From Swiss-Prot:
Organism: Conus raulsilvai (Sea snail)
Top-level taxon in the UniProt lineage: Eukaryota
Positions annotated as propeptide: 23-55, 71-83
Function according to Swiss-Prot or TrEMBL: Moderately activates human somatostatin receptors (SSTR) with a preferential activation of SSTR1 and SSTR4. In vivo, does not cause behavioral changes in mice within a few minutes of intracranial injection, but causes a progressive loss of movement thereafter. Four to five hours after injection, mice recover, even with the highest dose tested. Shows antinociception and antihyperalgesia activities in two mouse models of acute pain, most probably by acting outside the central nervous system.
Protein name: Consomatin Rs1
Length: 83
């Protein structure tokens, strides 16, 4: 717990120190983020991950062992199937 406190204090000092030298908060925050991290790059990364995930087949979710009615015409109870 004590270590977490000091890490938090040091982070606050690291962020606010440039402000005491006349820097603007917006510039300080931008300095903490790498230049190649942009909204466009983040969205491209997410889209490329979705393409790889498309290989995974769709598995319908069943809540409390009852599947949605659109899968089987009426409620399909997994407990009855196991008997």
């Amino acid at each position: 717990m004590q270590t977490a406190y000091w890490v938090m204090v040091m982070m606050m000092v690291w962020i606010t120190a440039p402000l005491s030298e006349g820097g603007k908060l917006n510039n300080v925050i931008r300095g903490l983020v790498p230049d190649d991290v942009t909204p466009k790059r983040i969205s491209q990364s997410l889209i490329s991950r979705r393409r790889f995930d498309s290989r995974i087949m769709f598995v319908p979710s069943c809540i409390w062992k009852t599947c949605p009615s659109y899968l089987h015409g009426d409620n399909y109870d997994l407990k009855e199937k196991d008997k």
